[in-house]
Amino acid sequence: MKYSLGPVLWYWPKETLEEFYQQAATSSADVIYLGEAVCSKRRATKVGDWLEMAKSLAGSGKQIVLSTLALVQASSELGELKRYVENGEFLIEASDLGVVNMCAERKLPFVAGHALNCYNAVTLKILLKQGMMRWCMPVELSRDWLVNLLNQCDELGIRNQFEVEVLSYGHLPLAYSARCFTARSEDRPKDECETCCIKYPNGRNVLSQENQQVFVLNGIQTMSGYVYNLGNELASMQGLVDVVRLSPQGTDTFAMLDAFRANENGAAPLPLTANSDCNGYWRRLAGLELQA
């Protein structure tokens, strides 16, 4: 299996991102995704900056993929997305059907991101015709669902025409909204948010009345409160999953990437902690569950 670093979903300063990707260039990742995937108002790093970072990574020997917005809300955003799609060098991760259409019109291959509502083989076949070469499974699906879906793909004769990627580490994006919950948590309207999410480099925690961390707010994203960690599920991915994705949580992610690789065959199990780690979705359980 290959290992990928997903796009940074948090709002980090440009300098922090540049330092992160400098380390990513020498990491054990096979694939690096980068780009603004959450909110177009996060302008500390502009489209041109992302493209420059991608070019600086091009000589690392890794596949570089440009990630795009999961929720397109304005015509101005389409102009920026067009710059990504027409970059002329790097593969695109499409997280919105508008970007899928842009790629299809230009006959460009793309990665279908986990934000696309793709739950069956017929949908995958449609995306294949439009140029999909890799599919990142929606985060709430289980191993059992994946097995059944790939069996459907076998019946349609398309199983070997695309790669399967699974988001296997990080806070999971559970929902997207036109509203900004981070701004709302500071009693700000979205139009006057002052990109306050930059104050929360790992999101803003939401606790239940029982003091359980149930969610993390990240701008328009509502994310899982616990960190999804499938580091001990890698053996069960053999023959099903081509690319294991880790969502950056900070520079510690590189050590976690190495730990995943070391445990690919179950030789070095990762220590997981209840009330901070979870693997429920993969096991077909409630998402916040952790099953050994």
Curated annotation (Swiss-Prot):
Swiss-Prot/TrEMBL cofactor(s): [4Fe-4S] cluster
Effect annotated for changing C193A: Alters ubiquinone synthesis in anaerobic conditions. Does not bind iron-sulfur cluster
Swiss-Prot/TrEMBL keywords: 4Fe-4S, Iron, Iron-sulfur, Metal-binding, Ubiquinone biosynthesis
Gene null: resulting phenotype: Deletion mutant is unable to synthesize ubiquinone under strict anaerobic conditions. Mutant shows normal levels of ubiquinone after aerobic growth.
Pathway involvement of the protein, from the record: Cofactor biosynthesis; ubiquinone biosynthesis
Organism domain of life: Bacteria
Molecular function per GO: 4 iron, 4 sulfur cluster binding; metal ion binding
Keyword Iron tagged: yes
Pfam short name (any one): Peptidase_U32
Binding site for [4Fe-4S] cluster: C39, C180, C193, C197
InterPro entries to which the protein is assigned, alphabetical: Peptidase_U32, RNA/ubiquinone_mod_enzymes, UbiV
GO process terms (BP): ubiquinone biosynthetic process
Coiled-coil stretches: none
Family designation: Belongs to the peptidase U32 family. UbiV subfamily.
Protein task: Required for O(2)-independent ubiquinone (coenzyme Q) biosynthesis. Together with UbiU, is essential for the C6-hydroxylation reaction in the oxygen-independent ubiquinone biosynthesis pathway.
HAMAP family per UniProt: UbiV (MF_02233)
Self-association state and partner proteins as the record states: Forms a heterodimer with UbiU.
Full protein name: Ubiquinone biosynthesis protein UbiV
Gene that produces this protein: ubiV
